[in-house]
Regions:
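N-terminal signal peptide c-region/cleavage motif recognized by signal peptidases
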Residues: 21-22
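Short, well-structured active-site flanking segments
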Residues: 85-100, 280-284, 385-388
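Mid-domain, small-residue-enriched loop/turn segments at the edges of structured enzyme/sensor domains
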Residues: 46-48, 105-179, 183, 326-371
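A small/polar active-site loop signature that marks catalytic segments
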Residues: 217-387
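Small-residue-rich helix-loop
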Residues: 60-62, 313, 323-467
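Beta-lactamase-like hydrolase cores
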Residues: 25-55, 61-68, 128, 133-137
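Active-site SXXK
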Residues: 57, 71-89, 146, 178, ...
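Short, Gly/Ser/Thr-enriched beta-strand-loop segments that form substrate-interacting elements
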Residues: 210-232, 255, 293-298, 403-435
Length: 467
């Protein structure tokens, strides 16, 4: 991390008599914020802050605001606003099922092609609906192979362990033109204290899955229950062992144990069998021929709904999908997406951003607090402002902020995106103060030794909300 020099808090008054109530004349950070930084053991030069009213031309607070910082998941603000602005809130994606010929007497001779377009939102339920459409159109037997067509994206090999050595975590899944169910398998842990054990139930259909291991039921508080589990994956088998506190109640455990092809194969075989279909072929990668005819298709929800899932819940793989959707041509490549978004930022006079995957799950991505602030100010004045603002978590109410700011002046009055990876904490969005004035607020901390990085950011938001 390069050395960071803080700027002083600047007081901008034009004219002064009209701005006394909305500006701070100080040579240091506001006392609540400075105190929170000290308590968290974050040096002031490892923090960047930017605050500006949406109807003002000058910031109230600009501390280290021009310094490139790692924003973690706050980078999703760039990706989602760019998507809304460039693609439009009504943009959708189609996933198609094609074949060389129509089915005869319920039998499809030859391969069935599944062609993806990069849909970020093809969940288990929506994939089931696509297969149900196939059945409704007369397909009951597939005699050939299932061919997975990912030609909409051209991507380098993805290593799910590269970021934090947690390859089974779904947040580490890579982008995929044929992404199904976020490449995720959902298990449910159900305490059974009477038998001293915990039941593990597979909620996501997966052909051939074998669950092994034993999870003991324990007393005490729930705490960080996931850290008490040991998870191993070997072929069709998932072994889960360790302990699980009965006080936790039922908990969902999401895993990404298989390659994309195997994950789709197991889900497809299980769902197709449930629908009464038969399949005797193999599952393989390939491309649909030009003469293939459409049999069934699924259209995604509009982008305006998708960005809500991305920002409310900080969904990384969905953000990666949107990032690639912004490439100007197909097959989409990461470099093409980076180039287009970088130019889009420059057109808005936001320079110096370093893009990687658009999700913020990166050690390389950078943007300044001022850059994020200018982005949010621009979004406020744009035609897609309602969709963008509605996509952000509401303080104390939903998404990643449901349990944050609940007993403060910010509750229900702040729409904010958070960012959290090791050594990084960030928050950025809009805050409505007690006088009904709306502010753009950005806070980024980059410090490997911080004790509680959320506290200074909470202090920042409260300080604005209480004005």
């Amino acid at each position: 991390m390069p050395d960071m020099r803080s700027t002083l808090i600047r007081f901008f008054a034009a004219p002064v008599l009209l701005c006394v109530s909305c500006a701070v004349l100080a040579a240091e950070l506001p006392a609540p914020l400075a105190g929170a930084l000290r308590d968290a053991k974050v040096p002031a030069n490892h923090a960047a802050f930017f605050i500006q009213r949406v109807d003002s031309d000058t910031p109230l607070l600009a501390h280290n605001a021009g310094k490139p910082m790692n924003p973690a998941s706050a980078m999703k603000l760039v990706t989602t606003y760019a998507a809304l602005d460039l693609l439009g809130p009504a943009a959708t994606w189609k996933t198609e099922a094609l074949a060389a010929s129509a089915p005869r007497d319920g039998k499809l001779e030859g391969p069935l092609y599944l062609r993806g377009s990069g849909d970020p939102s093809l969940t288990l339920e929506r994939f089931w609906l696509l297969l149900r459409k196939l059945r409704a159109r007369g397909v009951s037997e597939i005699a050939g192979d299932l061919v997975l067509d990912r030609s909409a994206f051209q991507l380098p090999a993805h290593d799910p362990a590269a970021f934090d050595n947690e390859p089974l975590r779904p947040y580490n899944a890579g982008a995929d033109a044929l992404l199904v169910n976020f490449k995720s398998l959902r298990l449910t842990l159900v305490p059974d204290p009477a038998n001293g054990a915990t039941r593990v139930i597979a909620e996501t259909p997966a052909d051939g899955l074998r669950l092994g291991g034993r999870v003991a039921s324990s007393d005490g508080e729930c705490g960080d229950w996931r850290e008490k589990l040991k998870i191993g994956s070997n072929g069709n088998s998932l072994d889960i062992s360790g302990s699980f506190a009965a006080a936790c109640g039922e908990k969902a455990l999401h895993l990404s144990p298989w390659s994309a092809d195997i994950q789709i194969e197991r889900l497809f075989r299980a769902l197709w069998r449930e629908l009464g279909g038969t399949f005797s072929g193999e599952v393989r990668a390939g491309a649909a021929p030009a003469e293939a005819r459409l049999i069934a298709a699924h259209e995604s929800p509009p982008l305006s709904e998708i960005v809500r899932d991305v920002n409310k819940w900080s969904n990384n793989v969905m953000a990666r999908q949107l990032f690639l959707a912004l490439a100007p041509s197909r097959p989409a490549t990461p470099d093409a997406a980076k180039a287009r978004i970088t130019q889009w930022l420059r057109d808005k006079h936001i320079d110096g951003a370093i893009l990687d995957n658009g999700a913020g799950l990166s050690r390389e991505e950078r943007i300044s607090a001022e850059g994020l602030g200018k982005l949010l100010l621009d979004a406020w004045k744009s035609p897609v402002m309602p969709e963008m603002m509605a996509s952000l978590p509401i303080a104390g109410s939903d998404g990643t902020l449901k349990k944050r700011f609940g007993n403060s002046a910010a509750a229900g009055r702040a729409h904010l995106k958070t960012g959290y990876i090791e050594g990084v904490r960030a928050i950025a969005g809009y805050v409505l103060d007690r006088e009904g004035r709306r502010w753009v607020v950005v806070g980024i901390l980059n410090d490997a030794q911080m004790k509680n990085g959320s506290a200074p950011l909470d202090a920042l938001v409260r300080w604005v909300a209480e004005r």
